[in-house]
A protein has these predicted regions:
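Alpha-helical interface subdomain recognition
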Residues: 1-84, 107, 120, 219-373
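N-terminal glycine-rich flavin-associated loop
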Residues: 86-108
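A generic structural signal for well-ordered coil/turn residues at beta-strand boundaries
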Residues: 97, 120-122, 152-154, 166, ...
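A generic local secondary-structure boundary/capping motif
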Residues: 113-114, 132, 144-148, 157-161, ...
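A short, Trp-centered hydrophobic/proline-enriched beta-strand micro-motif
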Residues: 119-129, 158
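Cytochrome P450 C-terminal beta-domain/meander region
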Residues: 130-141
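A short core secondary-structure module
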Residues: 143-179
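Flexible, small-/acidic-enriched active-site or ligand-binding loops
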Residues: 146-147, 173-208
């Protein structure tokens, strides 16, 4: 019986993705290669995953060429990509950009862009330019950083705020005059990041995708960001699996270290944190929330911020439990710690995320107390 809220077809997808990514991972060798390249992207693997396996369209509606498996489908995929730290633009293109386009684009633009996403024919980097870009005389100026997967994007989708406080969504070619994309090495070498600068870039040089109000746009962003919770669950599961395997093999004082009570307790704490994060992630994707956008927004806030904190704690504990080997470059555990640290701050910090949730439900919060600090 599949765990709530998944059905058998979701578990079939999980097994297919898990098998494919296991081959890609190659026992951790691929992560070392991707990290050494410095761009956090494996083009050949992405083409195979998106096109041959059909995973790019997992959550996109069938009318646009996708599989129509919604939030649950992408939760399954995100969890498995997190387990292997798959270096590809699944989140930026197939989750974040796809959600924005589905929510606010015209029907013609949906048919065009969502079908290209579903077929794996386009990579889109969706950027929030509010507070970062200035818009005067229909010219954009400023810099957005970090810009996830912008280095490899075929389309830069930018949200800006006009004088009427509307959110305007515009798509630009990376070759647009005045637009520059500069890759940089972030804390996480398995995820591609860049700075995208706008120097008098005209709105008319891009394709207007849609327009909406700030509240609707913010909710859409947070619901998309909630998918990162599944990635954190996958990464946390990998850290726990590696730790349990090591504790059952490492011998100290004449016995396996996993037999010591202090080690057992630490592993139990890691498991509890992981399962709590998993529950939050699955609830945020539950069909029970369909039709209630506010509930989806709140569930996504809880999931993303709790799961990212849990992943960070689990990854840190895993390194400590591995002793000296946990600090070596050759052992892949540090990549998971870096992804956990990156996810914790990506888009919004956990502190800001919990404060946003407190404001949403009308609660005066102490975010340090909420986060157990």
């Amino acid at each position: 019986m599949p765990p709530f809220p998944f059905q058998e077809d979701h578990e079939m997808i999980r097994e297919a993705v898990k098998g494919w990514l296991s081959d890609w991972e190659d026992g951790g060798k691929t992560l070392h290669r991707v990290a050494k390249d410095g761009y956090g992207f494996d083009r050949a693997a992405w083409d195979g995953f998106a096109r041959d396996q059909g995973m790019a369209g997992i959550s996109i509606a069938e009318q646009y060429g996708g599989a129509g498996m919604g939030l649950l489908g992408r939760t399954v995929v995100m969890e498995e990509t997190g387990y292997t730290l798959f270096s590809a633009p699944f989140f930026s293109t197939c989750v974040l950009a796809a959600d924005i386009i589905e929510a606010f684009a015209s029907e013609d633009d949906k048919a065009d862009l969502l079908s290209k996403i579903a077929s794996g024919d386009i990579i889109i980097s969706a950027l929030d330019g509010r507070g970062k870009l200035s818009l005067e005389d229909n010219k954009l100026n400023g810099t957005i950083s970090p810009a996830t997967d912008a280095v490899h994007a075929d389309l830069i989708l930018v949200a800006t705020q006009n004088k009427d406080n509307d959110i305007v969504l515009t798509g630009y070619s990376p070759n647009t005059a005045g637009l520059s994309v500069m890759p940089y090495a972030s804390i996480d070498p398995t995820r591609s990041q860049a700075k995208v600068s706008f120097d008098n870039v005209s709105l008319s040089d891009g394709q207007t995708i849609g327009k909406t109000d700030e509240n609707a746009f913010s909710q859409t962003l947070q619901i998309a960001h909630g998918a990162l919770a599944a990635e954190c669950v996958g990464g946390g599961q990998k850290c726990l699996d590696m730790t349990l395997d090591y504790a059952n093999q490492r011998v100290q004082f004449g016995r396996q270290i996993g037999s010591f009570q202090s080690v057992k307790h630490k592993c139990a704490d890691m498991f509890i944190a992981l399962e709590s994060a998993r529950s939050a992630s699955y609830f945020a994707a539950s069909p029970d929330l369909d039709g209630d956008r506010t509930a989806k927004f709140e569930a996504a806030l809880i999931a993303k911020n709790y799961a990212s904190e849990a992943f960070f704690k689990i990854a840190g504990d895993a390194i400590q439990m591995h002793g000296g080997i946990g600090f070596t470059w050759e052992y892949p555990l540090h990549y998971f710690f870096k992804r956990a640290r990156s996810n914790r701050a990506l888009f919004t910090s956990s502190e800001d995320g919990f404060q946003m949730l407190a404001d949403q439900i009308g609660l005066k919060s102490n975010t340090s107390a909420i986060m157990g600090k």
